[in-house]
């Protein structure tokens, strides 16, 4: 099947690499033009290197190689004004908006009683408030278009269950579910659907780094990806250690397409069965 989102425009936050880049490519493969946003800068409380302007440029290159249009802007999802300006610029150039992937997110770790105040605030501001900002900026365009639309928010298995040493992450990702369900109710009269995705570990830079490995192996001084592999696999029901970004992108494509035209308010795990363990 091809052209599943032909002629539509998708707004993706966190689009410079990882799941966001994968979403941009997968939607472009099926006919969508892309508005891509990423901070392309480091957040001090994040323990791994974040995306760069070169990463965002690579996303542009890969989308354009598919003969689709893309408008890419550096913006911080914590800054509503900047995010709205980025989206408005994209809509002005591409002419419409149909799909929103509120995907930007960070990870950091520590016992709840020991988290720094700024670490907590950064997590909530990016992983929860940032998703609200993306939706808030998009809603007027979706309503004005009169064609309905699809908002897909990236949560996590941590939005469905608890994990130790990640209270701020778990709180933000659970909060996303409440946001999604409320938006689904509010926007249903406009035929705008809102759903959330809940991945297990994904093979991206946000997961494949030593600080994340240490979360799952606190007794290992310098854990490697090979150390992490069996520990990660034990979290999933299916015998795999992690999923690939395209696995999440395929689920997002389904929710964005007319195949899911009556699906709204759903928490969709793409997690190799992690949520049922």
Task: Show the residue positions of the predicted features.
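Residue(s) in the substrate-gating loop at a strand-loop-helix junction
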Residues: 156
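Short C-terminal tail/terminal secondary-structure segment
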Residues: 161, 239-240, 252-253, 264-277
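Active-site helix of classical SDR
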Residues: 135, 172, 180
């Amino acid at each position: 099947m091809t052209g599943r989102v032909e002629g539509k425009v998708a707004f993706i936050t966190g689009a410079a690499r990882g799941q966001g880049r994968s979403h941009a490519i997968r939607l472009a493969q099926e006919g969508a033009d892309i508005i891509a946003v990423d901070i392309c800068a480091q957040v001090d409380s994040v323990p791994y290197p974040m995306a760069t302007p070169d990463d965002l440029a690579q996303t542009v290159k890969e989308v354009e190689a598919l003969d689709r249009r893309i408008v890419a802007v550096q913006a911080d999802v914590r800054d509503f004004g900047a995010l709205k300006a980025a989206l408005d610029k994209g809509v002005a150039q591409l002419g419409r908006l149909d799909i929103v992937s509120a995907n930007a997110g960070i990870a950091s770790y520590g016992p709840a009683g020991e988290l720094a105040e700024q670490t907590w605030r950064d997590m909530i501001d990016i992983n929860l408030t940032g998703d609200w900002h993306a939706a808030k900026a998009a809603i007027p365009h979706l309503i004005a278009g009169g064609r309905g639309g699809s908002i897909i928010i990236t949560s996590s298995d941590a939005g469905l269950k608890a994990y130790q040493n990640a209270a701020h992450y778990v709180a933000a990702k659970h909060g996303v579910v409440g946001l999604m369900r409320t938006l689904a109710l509010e926007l249903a009269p406009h035929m705008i659907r809102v759903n959330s995705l809940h991945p297990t570990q994904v093979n991206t830079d946000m997961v494949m780094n030593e600080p994340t490995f240490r979360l799952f192996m606190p007794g290992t001084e310098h854990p490697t990806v090979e150390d992490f592999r069996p520990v990660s696999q034990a979290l999933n029901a299916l015998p795999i250690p992690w999923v690939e970004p395209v696995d999440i992108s395929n689920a997002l494509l389904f929710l964005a397409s007319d195949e899911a035209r009556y699906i709204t308010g759903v928490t969709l795990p793409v997690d190799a069965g992690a949520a049922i363990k």
